[in-house]
Structures are given as structure tokens and as C-alpha cells.
Design a protein with these regions (language model features):
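Intrinsically disordered, low-complexity regions of eukaryotic proteins
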Residues: 10, 39, 64, 185-186
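Hydrophobic membrane-insertion alpha-helices, especially the h-region
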Residues: 1-11
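Residue-identity detector for threonine
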Residues: 12, 84-86, 97, 148, ...
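Membrane/wall-proximal cationic-aromatic binding patches
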Residues: 19-143
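Conserved SGNH/GDSL esterase-like catalytic core that processes O-acyl groups on lipids
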Residues: 92, 118-119, 127-186
Length: 186
């Protein structure tokens, strides 16, 4: 087991997969004449500093906010920070951002004031990870006039998603619940 640990340390120190992956993306973008924003989230944040909205970086997952009180009750954060400019990710050349809704999800807040027809439950795919908001699943469904809320969050699994469904179903009473299950990480 020591040799496996040493191998992991060696790979971590001497082989930076993330860096190689980024270089490949930059190379492909250049070949396709795509202007790729290479700024880090911190550099992007510094560029928009002074904005009236608070900024939060995506990646604060549910496990970071599990709290127990003295009665052994567990409090679990179901969404992100509400009504906040969220810097999400950059996988395809631009930094994806959105203003979260009143419950911290990637929805236009005014949708909560409508009769909801559909809710989407899932992980980063439903969240709209690294996709412009007008291209994500819920925006596409909304563009056809079917009021839809997305309760997708990257890094969540079926139990967390069930908790989201139990909490927000009663607020929305939709006609349809559409559950996205991804076999590779759920």
C-alpha cells in the first residue's frame, strides 16, 4: 500500500493532468479560430470587481455545509447562494456566469412567480455546467412556453437530489418532474 501511495504522490507532483487538458483545449480552440478566455476564476473576478452583485465561485458543494446542532439534527445546504452573480466554469472558451434565483439555483428568478409546469432534477448536466444560459436544458424548454425550473447542482447524487425534490416540489407543485440520472457518477 505504501508503493501505491508513493505512485499517487509522484503522479500528482510530476503529471499535471489539468494543465495538459487545458493546453489541449487551447490548441483545439486556436485551430478552430475560437478566442479562448484563459483567465482563472480569480483573474475573472478581479476584472468584474466593483460589480454591485456579490460573487461566489461554483464549487461549494453540499458537503461543505452539513451542520449538526446540539439535538443531533442535520442541516444540509440544498442550493447555492441566492440572488448572487455566480462564476461557474470555463470549459469551452468563455467564463459561464449566471445570477442565481431566490433559492440559489440557476433559474431566472421571475419564473418562481409563474405556475410551474416542469421541474428538472439532476447534477451538473441539469445545472447547465459551462453552457451559456440560453443553451441549457431548462432555458430550451422555457423557450417553448413551458415554465420550467432547474434544480440541478454539480456534485450532487440521488440522495441530495431527492432532498431537493422533497423541499421544492411542495413550493412548485409542477405537472411534471423530470429526473436526470447519470450512471458514471451517480
Amino acid at each position: 500500500s505504501i508503493s501505491i501511495l508513493l505512485l499517487e504522490v509522484f503522479i500528482t507532483i510530476f503529471y499535471n493532468y489539468d494543465s495538459d487538458f487545458k493546453k489541449k483545449r487551447y490548441s483545439v480552440a486556436k485551430k478552430q479560430n475560437i478566442n479562448f478566455d484563459k483567465r482563472s476564476k480569480i483573474e475573472f473576478f478581479n476584472h468584474i470587481d466593483g460589480n454591485d452583485n456579490k460573487v461566489i465561485f461554483q464549487g461549494i458543494y453540499d458537503k461543505a455545509f452539513i451542520k449538526k446542532n446540539n439535538k443531533n439534527l442535520v442541516y444540509w445546504n440544498l442550493g447555492q447562494v441566492s440572488n448572487t452573480l455566480t462564476v461557474h466554469c470555463n470549459e469551452i472558451g468563455y467564463m459561464n456566469t449566471y445570477i442565481s434565483d431566490r433559492y440559489g439555483f440557476n433559474n431566472k428568478d421571475f419564473l418562481w412567480d409563474k405556475k410551474i409546469e416542469n421541474i428538472l432534477i439532476g447534477d451538473s448536466f441539469v445545472h447547465g455546467a459551462c453552457v451559456k444560459n440560453e443553451k441549457n436544458i431548462s432555458s430550451n424548454i422555457n423557450s417553448y412556453g413551458s415554465s420550467t425550473l432547474s434544480f440541478g447542482l454539480g456534485g450532487t447524487g440521488p440522495l441530495h437530489q431527492l432532498a431537493i425534490l422533497k423541499e421544492y416540489y411542495k413550493l412548485t407543485r409542477p405537472k411534471n418532474v423530470i429526473y436526470f440520472y447519470y450512471e458514471d457518477n451517480d
